[in-house]
Amino acid sequence: MAKAKFDRSKPHVNIGTIGHVDHGKTTTTAAITKVLSEKYPEENQAFAFDAIDKAPEEKERGITINIAHVEYSTPKRHYAHVDAPGHADYIKNMITGAAQMDGAILVVAATDGPMPQTREHVLLARQVGVPYILVALNKCDMVDDEDLIELVEMEVRELLAEQDFDEDAPIVHISALKALEGDEKWEQSILDLMDACDESIPDPVRETDKPFLMPIEDIFTITGRGTVVTGRVERGKLNINDDVEILGIKEKSQNTTVTGIEMFRKQLDYAEAGDNCGLLLRGTKREDVERGQIVAKPGAYTPHTEFEGSVYVLSKDEGGRHTPFFDNYRPQFYFRTTDVTGVVKLPEGTEMVMPGDNVDMSVTLIQPVAMDEGLRFAIREGGRTVGAGRVTKINK
């Protein structure tokens, strides 16, 4: 059976749900797909809560771990939606997830207001460069007190302003559960939420004109066809049968040809910046590639090991370190989809860096990473984010 072609006639926007565990991110995602599939059935299918929440580890703990991808359309746009993990233990996925968003829906339970992970996710969204956040105030069916809702709204706006997001962003009152149960009033609230997404999340500025670059997130073997690497295209455009170079992490880069491109299980003739897709690589073995490498136009990008970065070190209250660090500090630097250990050299005259400080530092990585100025990274220790920065200068 020939696979359906992917429709590109509408602007394509990557979106996602972020927020505190149990505030209803996955329920909101399910409600959006259900309500849109009923209103615009020819363009949408409903994804059940369980289908979104489907990774096996999640079931035991009732928390979202893996990132679920769903798609839906409004009359104005096609959305690819990631349901980002909710639990602090899974921040690593949050970083890869949030990095795939042109805008985020921050889900806050009206019954609780902003919680520690709400703050953490907004901070992470800023670190990884999510350009816009709007708010779904969930569980509004459970709160009768208008003053209480107003108070929660004020807290949320303060939180957005703290991290330089638009404090006048739409805050839409919803009940995801009631919408899933078919309550008309709350179904309408989900449509209002999607209108707010259409109106407030700017059309993404795609980096289509730059040379092709896609960070590898995952690798699969398809029997009889070869190796497929998946990720979100960061820059440029790629046609079937184009030559590519796979570089970073390993000592040597390698060249191969892309023999197939898929998105949402549909065949594409080409992939361009912003697409989440899989690339079939000719003659490439699974062990030849790894997460964290990039697939790129040959010769367009070079891996580097030494750079200077401007870094914000999280305070203790933001979940960062409790103690200062010194010269020769060796944390992990999280670029795009992977951690690489690096050695930090502090500027002359700086003895130590305290949690909450901003600092410019020189870093030497133990493995090469394809980078250019402006690339963002997180600094992590044992799986928790302790800092965020961007590359200001490449030294080697």
Swiss-Prot record:
This protein's GO CC annotations: cytosol
Reactions catalysed: GTP + H2O = GDP + phosphate + H(+)
Residue ranges, annotated region (G2): 62-66
Keyword GTP-binding: yes
Gene3D superfamilies: P-loop containing nucleotide triphosphate hydrolases (3.40.50.300), Translation factors (2.40.30.10)
Cross-referenced InterPro entries: EF-Tu_GTP-bd (IPR041709), EF-Tu_GTPase (IPR050055), EFTu-like_2 (IPR004161), EFTU_2 (IPR033720), G_TR_CS (IPR031157), P-loop_NTPase (IPR027417), Small_GTP-bd (IPR005225), T_Tr_GTP-bd_dom (IPR000795)
Location within or outside the cell: Cytoplasm
Chain residues that bind GTP: 19-26, 83-87, 138-141
Region (G3): 83-86
EC number from the UniProt entry: 3.6.5.3
UniProt region (G4), positions on chain: 138-141
Region of interest: G1: 19-26
Binding annotation for Mg(2+): T26
GO terms, molecular function: GTP binding; GTPase activity; translation elongation factor activity
The UniProt record lists the keyword Secreted: no
CDD domains per the UniProt record, alphabetical: EF_Tu, EFTU_II, EFTU_III
UniProt superkingdom: Bacteria
Domain (tr-type G): residue spans on this chain: 10-205
Keyword vocabulary terms for this entry: Cytoplasm, Elongation factor, GTP-binding, Hydrolase, Magnesium, Metal-binding, Nucleotide-binding, Protein biosynthesis
Annotated region described as G5, given as residue ranges: 175-177
Role: GTP hydrolase that promotes the GTP-dependent binding of aminoacyl-tRNA to the A-site of ribosomes during protein biosynthesis.
Family matches, as PANTHER family: ELONGATION FACTOR TU, MITOCHONDRIAL, ELONGATION FACTOR TU-RELATED
Annotated NCBIfam families: EF-Tu, PRK00049.1, PRK12735.1, PRK12736.1, small_GTP
Family to which the UniProt record says this protein belongs: Belongs to the TRAFAC class translation factor GTPase superfamily. Classic translation factor GTPase family. EF-Tu/EF-1A subfamily.
Protein name: Elongation factor Tu
Organism this protein belongs to: Corynebacterium kroppenstedtii (strain DSM 44385 / JCM 11950 / CIP 105744 / CCUG 35717)
